[in-house]
Structure formats: structure tokens, C-alpha cells
Amino acid sequence: IADDPAWEQAILDRVKRMVARDKNRFCIIFWSMGNESAYGCNFEKALAWTKKYDPSRITQYESARYRNYDVTYDYSNLDLYSRMYPALSEIEEYLEKDGSKPFLLVEYCHSMGNGPGDLEDYFQIIQKDARMCGGFVWEWCDHAVAHGLAENGKTKYYYGGDHGETIHDGNFCMDGLVYPDRTPHTGLLEYKNVYRPVRVVSYDEKTGRLVLHNYMDFDDISDYADILYEITVDGLCVQKGVLDEVSIAPHSDGVMTLKLDIPQSGKVYLKLRYQLKKELPLLPAKHELGFDEVLLANVDGRNQTAVKWLAEAEEKNEISVSETDTEITLKASDFTYAISKKTGLFTKLQYAGRDYLNHPMELNIWRAPTDNDMYIRAKWENAHFHEAYTRAYKVETIQNQYGVIVMSHVGVVAPTVQKILDVELVWKVESSGRITASMEVSKDAEFPELPRFGVRVFFNKNLSEASYYGMGPQESYRDKHRAASHGLYRSAVKDLHEDYIMPQENGSHFDCDYVELYNGRYGIAAVSETPFSFQASNYTQEMLAQAKHNYELEESDSTVLCIDYALNGIGSNSCGPEVLAAYRFDEKEFQFGFTLVPYVKG
């Protein structure tokens, strides 16, 4: 149609009517010839007419790249080179090899479900080259039809296929930055802070030299923003104030001095908050425009709460060890633990007379696929990751004055495929009840990147409260954490769930030092010397993967804790490019360790 002269008048008429209708609307900044309709002689003429009729506005047409490559076309009346969802490498290639027209991301960062995970990377390339115009995130809101309330009180949102229609796009209409009721997704929070108007360029702890960049196009920073600062140590604020007003012109760096007395132990962050100086028609004064955080160097930068959790108990009580053909049982004055010889993992954690485990522990490489996993999911399922389980080939026990060490050679395996992972797993159990895990993991290179790797623990549901130090308060991932900040957070486990209309992986927290699950009487902490991710939920990943709507979900019988070495990135591959290589979990060999510390309050 685009290159068939028989359609010339129809296409011209449509474009002319559009221009005539909207020509006096000052919000129209350029004319687009259409969407996903290819290119040809008819659009050449439509562009020529538009430019002649209204030379004051620029023109764009993303589909100009879909053409007959045996024909030479006229692009002289197109002002922009437009693309939907290009990979960063494609943008760089255009800027290096052509770059004759400004580059417009006419759609990018597809915001379907848990995502997008690549906003920061697009922001960086947009800022790096003056030929980059910016772009339009697809899209604003999830589209669904509300059908009253389910028995659990949740709104029943219907999408493609839910009304019995045979031709539909499923939940592909659920791809916005806000839910159908306009409640923000975590993706909108990510978007907001990525596009904050001010950013820290550098900070020198010794001299106090702070360099900021003003990303505004017209306003001096002194005209629109107050800058507040706070110093936190292991999540607790120890100092705060307001920076002196500084003048920084648009698109410029500015320098100021902020001398700080930096604590010499603990994980210390400087956080800058940018607040609106005065009321605007749509925003109140003191509205937060965004924030930065800077990790400050000191003598001992370890989280001191984590250090205390990791310190060995002074008491040395005897641990009795008994074995059957299937199980190893460890007993001391305060605990009874059991490890399966079939898996090398705990099947019982009884501490101070309380059973902590509802179901056996698992090594875990699966996650409930996100919308952005829709293409990699086929590779994962072809590799049978969703059917993976743990098999122990050798289990040995060594007892010494420090406790009991259980060493296992285990594999993560699945039906009909070769072994996915080889794991040398060591559990060290101290007489105090502390359990330390050490793992050396090797992955078969034939398999694709893993969804995740970690340990999944099905705790007693009475452990319904969580406290953690890491990135929060909302969910955060290796490529989706710019709206989260390091801090000490407390939450009910049920509130850590992000309730996507189409259930999927959610609620993970990135770059954590420890997480604690507890109730009013007892609890357990998971701590590591190296940062990890965790997810605490009342739903299993199998439940999330099976349900088609959030109102169908019913809570499991457990508080499910995933202690993860890493997860694959989130990305925006539901319509955009694959997850960037830097965020893929494709390590062939790695080590992971953590410590579990059960306790009784009082």
C-alpha cells in the first residue's frame, strides 16, 4: 500500500485531514505520517505536501526504514531518523556510520509487567550525543476492563481472551507505567529517578568538593531546586542538612563544597534529595524531584549489623550427629537439624523447640517468568530450568571442636538434559545453631543464562515480618534499582509483593547485606559477607507462573525466602531488545555463601 500509486489519494487525504485538524494546536511539535505502515512513493508525496503546507514543524516517520531495498527513495522531507526499541548497539552504529538526522526513540523501554530494566542505559546514550532527541516510553497505563471484585477483595481486571474472544493479544495491552487504576508501577518510580533534573558527577571525601550537573534545558538550578543531604550509617541517619544555594546553568556542571565528618566504621552513604523550591501549577513546593546516593570510603566499610550477625558465638556446646541411609541429624541443646542425603540440603530446622521449616530447602535456578522474559522463557523451558531439582552424589560429615561440617557434591539437574550445575556445597553448623553455607558452582556452558541462582527456603508462615539492609523500599534488580536506595527497611512480608495484574517474578531486593524474618517471639537472619538479593513472599514461583490474574492467587502455607547470588536482568524484551550483556546472569563459575542465624527474642 505504501508504494502502490492506487493508494496515493487515500494516504494523502488522511495526512491532509490530520494536519488541517491539528494545525492550530500549539502542543503539536511535529507531524508523523503514521505507524508501522512501511514506506514508499505515497509517503514521499505525503511528506512533501506536509513540508510545503507547514514548514514550521518537523516531520518523522519510523516506518521509513521498512522499504523495498531495490528502490532508492526520497527522504529529504524527513527531519528525524526514528526507531522503535532499538538495541543500544544499533543506536551507536547509526551515530557512528550515518548520523545525518537526529535520532528519535519513537518508542522505547516497553513497560510491561516487571520492568523496564534498561532506562538508565538509554538515558546515558541519549545524554552522550547531541544528535539524540530522547524518546517516548511505551506506554503510560495498563489497559484492562474492571469486572467488579473477587472474593478476596481484589479488582478483577480482564485483558485479551478473558471475554471469550478468539483473536486477541492476551495481556499485551498491560504494558504501562501505571496500573489500570493509575497507581504507579515500580517502573514509573524508576523512570522518575533516572530522569531526575540534577545528578552528582563526583564527590571527594577529603576535600568536600561536590560536582553537580544540571540537566534542565532552561532553568538554573538555583531557581527551581533545594538540595537536602543526609548521612546514613548502616541505614541510620546520623547527620542531615540543606546545601547552600548554588547557581548552575542549564546543561552545565557546578562545584560546591560539602565537608563531612565521615564515620570510620559501617556502610556510609551520602544521599542528596532534590526538592522543588516553589509551588508549580501541578506540584507542591518541596515535591521530591529525585535523589542521588554516594558510597563514602572509610576505614571499615562493612555493615556493622551484618558483622555482628556473622560473629561466631563464644559458647561451644557439643553437637551429636546421627545418620541413617537417607538423613543426617544434628542435635545440640538448642536445636535439631536434619540434612537429606538425597539433596545435601536441610529438611528440618528446629530451634528452641520451634519448627522453622515447612518444606525441604532447595537450590533454585527458576523464577516465575516476567512479561519481559517472554522470549528467553522458551530457551529456559527448552533447557528444563523450570523442572530443575537438586541431587546429591556424595555427602560427608566432619565433626570438630568448632561444630559439624557437612560437605556435599551436588548437581542441579532436570529431566532429559545433561547436568545444569555442579555444586560443591559445604554447611558449617555451630553449636549455637548458626549455619554457614559455602558453594562453588560450575555451569555447563551449553545452557543459556540462568534465571537466578540461590537457595529457596520455605519458612513457617508465622515469620511474617521482614527487616533488611539493602536496596528498597520497592523491588530492585541488577538493571532496575535507580529508584531504590540503600537503607534499613522493615515491612510485613505480604507488603513486599508487587501485585502485577499478570502474576510474575516480583519483589526481589538487590545489593543486600542481611535480611531478617521474625514475629513477636522468634526469628532468623540470612547474612552474607558479599551483597546478595533476596525475595520474601507468601507465594511460590510456581503459583505466580500458573496464575493468569492476580485475583486468582491464594497464599501458600509458607513464608518463602529466596536467598540469591544473582538474578538475570529484567530488561524490556517484551517488545524491546534482549537484556544487555552486562545484566545477563551467564557466569560459568562462581562462589556464593551466606549464614543463617536463628534466634529467640528475650
Q: Predicted regions: what is each one?
A:
Residues K259-G266, L280, L295-G602:
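Beta-strand/loop-rich accessory regions of lumenal/periplasmic or secreted enzymes
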Residues A225, E230, G235-S265, Y274-Q275:
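Intrinsically disordered, low-complexity Pro/Gly/Ser/Thr-rich segments with frequent PxxP/GP/PP motifs
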Residues E139, I231-V233, L276, F459, ...:
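Residue-level signal for short segments within beta-strands and strand-turn junctions
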